Amino acid sequence: ARLYAQNQVTITGCEFEGNNDGGIGIDLDGSSVKALIQNSRIHSYKLDSLGDINQECIGIRVRNGASARIVNNLIHGCKDRIHNGNETNSGFGIFITSGSSAFIHGNILWDCYVSRYYTGPENPTGALICSFGQATISHNILWQFTPDIYEGGHTREVQITLKEAQATHSILADPKFTDINNSDFTLASDSPAINAGPPDPQYNDRDGSRNDIGMFGGHNFIPDGRTTNKPIVLGLDVAPIAVPTGGPVTIESTGATVK
């Protein structure tokens, strides 16, 4: 995995690129894990494998009792493009194992699959989201991107494979990025992702409008790499140093204004 976590972790405004060598982008392992993954891009965990693979080509894996909130991310290109060999639990944007849990809101997922023949519901392989655990999935865009297929075979690509999860209010459509071919993932003016994310005000965009689905939605991240556009406090002066209970105290701050 590019990031392996066994404790609490918050990931904001990051990019995890698989460099076309399979593997897993973010691996959340164990009941001590309480993770928040937001405003990030996880992509290109892919292979052209002739042999058997097991739990490969996965954007985010939540396992062994871990829990995660996955909000306003882009997850794509998690796939095995050659149908030779057996692919087990592989080719997933998000994979949640039994006993683990996740809230998945406001994300755009596409191009996660395996090129093989489907072997039945007890061994699902190739899906944007696969959950054997407790998952709440809402207000995402699940895009059936047209995959490239090497060496023939049948492409296994579905939006969601679920056992104990609930999926609601998601959009099955092209998200209409500004220029996907040049990695400009801002939203075009007619994108169905605009104002279509989770409606709870805690997820609102920085301008106060409803959450936009995708990595630029919400108010926790500013695209130039900062996490706030408000003044930043650099120091505090308190006088007097000691006062009786209920006595007055003056606090002066020094800081900087973000430009």
Kindly give the residue locations of the regions a language model identified:
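Predominantly extracellular beta-rich ligand-binding scaffolds that present long acidic/polar faces
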Residues: 13, 28-29, 36-44, 48-184
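Ser/Thr- (and often Asn-) enriched beta-sheet segments in non-cytosolic proteins
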Residues: 2, 8-10, 34-36, 235, ...
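Short, compositionally biased P/S/T/A/G/V-rich stretches that sit at domain boundaries
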Residues: 216-258
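C-terminal accessory segments
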Residues: 168-229
